[in-house]
Amino acid sequence: MSKFFLYLVLILFLSNCGFKDKKVEQNPNAITLFEKSKPIEQELNPTLNIKISTITKGEPFLSSNSNNSGNLDFNSNFENAFSYKFSTIDQFKFNQPEILFTEDNSLVFFTGKGEIFKTSTDFAEYWKVNHYTKKEKKLKPILYFAQSGPDILVLDNLSKVYSIKLETGELNWTIESKVGFNSNAKIIKNSVVAVDFDNVIRAFSVKDGKELWNFDTDNPFIKSQKKLSLVTKGEVVFFINSIGDVTALNANDGSLVWQTPTQSTLIFQDAFTLENSDIIFANDTIYFSNNRNEFFAIDARSGVLKYKQTINSSLRPTVIEDYVFSISKEGFLFVIDDKTGNVLRITNIFKKIENKKKQIEPTGFILAQNKIYVSLNNGKLIKLNAVSGNEEGFYKIGKSRINRPNVFDDGMFILKSN
């Protein structure tokens, strides 16, 4: 059996600038609201140039509540790289583990046995701790992080919730929840919130781990392994469950603001195959897509559908000004006019790739200084011009899957399997 490792790859650069189930009656004359469509595999207006003038300030990957990274202030020649090697993380593709970037300019991640480590941005190790029993280590827990001042909140897929000190990794407190967690975690109103495998969102006190509130949504018998996501804005938390219901809650008490289903009730019989992208918040709108050829823009204030497009993607989209960017599983870059919901341009990002013996798929993307960096499941990174959609570079990071790039403190961080 071959050994499996994950690496963190840091690329440095010199920059010029700093509800309950609903019964459905069958009616032969009824209008179909949830139509199935085929993936789009042809270009549209490929020579159209778009204008982008906004550069995102600050560190969008540092405690981002919106999940929208925008147009980052980043550029690189990809000549300098460092790596940090650590052990197996199971189901790398579905669990989609994320690095925690901290307010003291360091990063925190975990190994396959639940060991948590903290390093500098050039991988000088500060500390490494493990707060799991021998039995728990064998279960290879998946960890989700969030920072609250001097502490790191940790939630895992085994149902543990605990707090450790950012400076030392020392344990502050630990509790057991009812079910393991399957989403990213966010800090809001002195609480940490996340969604569990039963499609229940829970809020815990960052001080002692006491559960403050929870909210149940529909829960299919067969569980999906695809990681779920949530975002926060003001005193509202938005999340998507495994059957595609988008819910907005009052973060103070977990009371319902609105809920919008995006799939028919028939989805219950095959909910485990549904893969939604991470949701993002921008322009008072919730955006996401799925592997059923659907892209949604939902009004964050009312839950009303603003528009829907045909995009076959489970990758996190990005919004810059009035442009929405998404990349389909088939390798087509979509640019949507957010004001009208119309697709402005579709570009095939794989058209210059000659050897396609292996099924090549994008795994994520970011935008930076009007460039788009697309990670692939074959270990490559494509650089595109966001204005024109043309390819500008092709870089080999590894030989197998790499995750969506992250940018922090003048470096690009990439998780890869090998």
Stretches found by the model and what they are:
Residues E41-K113:
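Beta-strand-rich domains and repeat architectures in extracellular enzymes and scaffolds
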Residues E43, G58, F82-F101, E125-A146, ...:
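Extracytoplasmic beta-rich repeat domains
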Residues F117, Y162, R202, E211, ...:
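WD40 beta-propeller blade core
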Residues V319-I320, S326-I336, N342-K383:
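Loop/turn-rich, solvent-exposed surfaces of beta-rich toroidal or solenoidal domains
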Residues L14-Q42:
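Bacterial Sec signal peptide processing site at the extreme N-terminus
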Residues S120-A124, K165-G169, S205-G209, N250-G254, ...:
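Short loop/turn segments that connect beta-strands within beta-propeller blades
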